[in-house]
Amino acid sequence: MLLSIIIVNYNVRYFVEQCILSVARSKGIPLEEVEVFVVDNHSSDHSVSHLRHCFPASFPLRVEVIANRQNLGFGRANNQALHQVTGKYVLFLNPDTVLTEDTLHEVLQAAESHPEAGVFGVKMLQSDGSFAKESRRGLPTPWTAFCRMTGLGNLFPKTRLFGNYYMQFLDLTQFTPIDIVSGAFMLGEREKLLKMEGFDEDYFMYGEDIDLSYRLLQAGFHNFYVPTPILHYKGESTRKYTYRYVHVFYQAMFIFFKKHFHRSAIWLSVPIRLAILLKAFLSLIPLPFHAIRNYLNPASAHPSPHILYLGRSGTAVRELAARHGIHIDILDADATSLPEGHLTKGIDLKPYLIIAYDTADFPFRFILNRFETAPTGKRHIGLFHPDAQLLVTGKRIFT
């Protein structure tokens, strides 16, 4: 087996379905040499039965679903599958990602060319096509962490002194060594990952990727950034400014300092806890206003997006729109008839929040390239999968 892909799921069955469908579109590698292990952390949305139904033995990829009876957390669930997979390479992959047809081929080529490597990451794009800064990170030393927490890194993002956390001084288009690879897409040799004993299970949700990347560096390996794009919905699916997120994230950072920078952990404990309280306070300020707005205008809690659909399955899309009471304009097209996609001159994009591409008519690489060419922050990617009758956006899913 060439490649084993591990996906940890918790109540996001449609994202997992879409992710696996994108893997199955991979070119340049034999699909019979790829296996997918989904570790379900005791989801309540019928994920296990849904995924087993979607991906039977006849599916081009071997898909195994492990059903846990409790939520083991990210690291422990990944390790659970790591000890069962058989591939030469292992890819830890978030469920809210979409690969292009070339992603696996390009990263595996890099892996074969760099036996000195620990793990590889990729260029992650947010749903508006903009670059996700988490794609490349520097080692969070006490100084780097201080710059991030105080905002110095935001003031001087492209300097090595202050902006090392996100390494924005590096060229996005170049294959380059980095310190930290995101756990959303982390590929490495199985034997090396087993030697490192996988993820540290002291972390529950955040920080595991930082810890593993650092341990690989300490062991003499090098981590790399491969400038091939994937879609990652994290900006939409993770509430970064809730108290829970802030608390768990900074606690994970403190665990990292305590483990790897023990002397610094003592004097860092106070500012880290102050940062948690400050950011938690700032995250709570908007909540009463949102509650009042949603009470006075319940529709504002889940606004109906104005969608432009590009593809050949207009009838199915109209039926889906009618079921959900949403407005979708239809442009009958494919990649051949509309080579510039939604960027074609003459298409008025102003009314639309979502540009939904039909995945049967447009390659994933085509879609991501068009959004990456002109990200605006106003319009976001939608993906319609006609065989599954599934429309996925960052904030809502329509079936």
Language model: regions and residue ranges:
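Short, well-formed alpha-helical segments that are part of the catalytic scaffolds
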Residues: 7, 12-27, 320-321, 343
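A conserved acidic beta->alpha catalytic loop
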Residues: 22, 40-49, 70
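Short, flexible, basic/aromatic active-site loop/helix in glycosyltransferases
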Residues: 139-178
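A short, conserved alpha-helix in the catalytic core of glycosyltransferases
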Residues: 171-174, 179-229
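Active-site-adjacent helix/loop segment of glycosyltransferases
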Residues: 214-290
